[in-house]
């Protein structure tokens, strides 16, 4: 949290119709975060339309379709991030995980060194002294060993980026110290060796 405040991170919350998001916005503002209002960026619509028009998935879209697409607050907020008008966005209270992920892949893209998209839950202890990263809880239901290794490495990297702490990585399964023989346990064992 302090890292975000120190760099002056600008956050856009595209789902302000949800009471929980409005409460979160108030809390973030009370913590001195800069919460951007989508309405304040309507003058940039032409910039966002031009950006959107250059993306592969909008090939041959008429101007009306581009405008309609950006009428969705999630897509508009993604354009804000992609065009460097916001540092990050938080979504998923109103839109499904798949809608958010699809929009990220289409409009922002994934890191060139990554072969997949995965998710994390970043949890801060009630006293604020500890942070935990849990992955992948929502995107890849049956990752293979290579995917598990990549998820672990990228999650550890993200944890370090957010906290500055050296992460300790654990792969969890239903087997206690190798008590079970199962292909799901074998995948975890193989991932650790990678």
Task: Label the predicted regions.
Residues 1-34, 40-194:
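Anion-binding alpha/beta catalytic cores of soluble intermediary-metabolism enzymes, centered on
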């Amino acid at each position: 949290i302090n890292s975000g405040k120190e760099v002056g991170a600008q956050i856009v919350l595209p789902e302000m119709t949800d009471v929980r998001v409005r409460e979160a916005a108030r809390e973030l503002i009370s913590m001195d975060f800069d919460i951007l209002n989508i309405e304040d960026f309507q003058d940039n619509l032409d910039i966002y339309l031009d950006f959107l028009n250059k993306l592969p998935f909008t090939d041959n879209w008429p101007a009306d379709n581009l405008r309609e697409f950006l009428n969705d607050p999630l897509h508009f907020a993604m354009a804000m991030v992609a065009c460097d008008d916001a540092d990050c966005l938080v979504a998923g209270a109103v839109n499904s995980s798949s809608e958010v992920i699809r929009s990220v892949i289409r409009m922002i893209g994934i890191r060139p060194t990554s072969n997949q998209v995965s998710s994390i839950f970043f949890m801060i202890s009630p006293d604020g002294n500890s942070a935990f990263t849990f992955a992948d809880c929502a995107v890849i239901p049956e990752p293979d060993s290579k995917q598990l290794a990549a998820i672990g490495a990228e999650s550890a990297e993200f944890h370090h980026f957010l906290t500055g702490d050296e992460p300790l990585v654990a792969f969890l399964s239903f087997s206690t110290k190798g008590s079970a023989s199962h292909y799901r346990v074998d995948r975890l064992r193989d991932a650790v060796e990678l």
